[in-house]
Amino acid sequence: MLYWKRVVSFAELIFKLSMTQKYSIELIEEHDAVNFYSVHLGEEELSELERFFEKFPEGCDFDEDIDTIVAWLDRIGESGALERYFRYEGKFGDGVSAIPIETSNLRLYCIRLSDKILIFGNGGVKDCATWQESESLSEYVETLVDTSRFISSRLTNGTLYIVDKEIIGNLNFTRDEKK
């Protein structure tokens, strides 16, 4: 009986470990008006923003949509991450948004932390009416919702703070995936 409990406990431990996602937030571009950060999953070589663009190489069926997103990123880089540039996708107050604001086949998800700080996640083809119904998009948005919650908590307890366009403090996170 004791042996069985150990096996079950070990199996539960392995299961829990396999459902844990480690990642960080890294600065990827500095502009006069805003800094762009991106989620970087621990096991991946590229940031989530880079992985998004890798999915849609030049000459793909979504060139026009990618051009629209790039135009928005250029505009945000020049003017800042103003609220009117984003389509809100998360819960009230979490800052989770999508680019572009106009109708498009693609969504790039991000956290608008302020007019001066934007944190990118990943995104993809809008294959359902809402991100909650999409297997691929829901994973990206849920990661950002959790990240927003982690950042808010750290800002509140003083282990993370914002100075102008910089996020200062521990930008490493561990997330239990909800599968």
Please give the residue ranges for each predicted region.
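Short, surface-exposed charged micro-motifs
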Residues: R107-Y109
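Active-site beta-strand-loop-beta-strand hairpin of nuclease catalytic cores
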Residues: I111-F120
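Basic, Lys/Arg-enriched alpha-helical interface segments
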Residues: L2-N105, D127-K179
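Acidic/polar active-site rim loop that often engages polyanionic ligands
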Residues: G121-K126
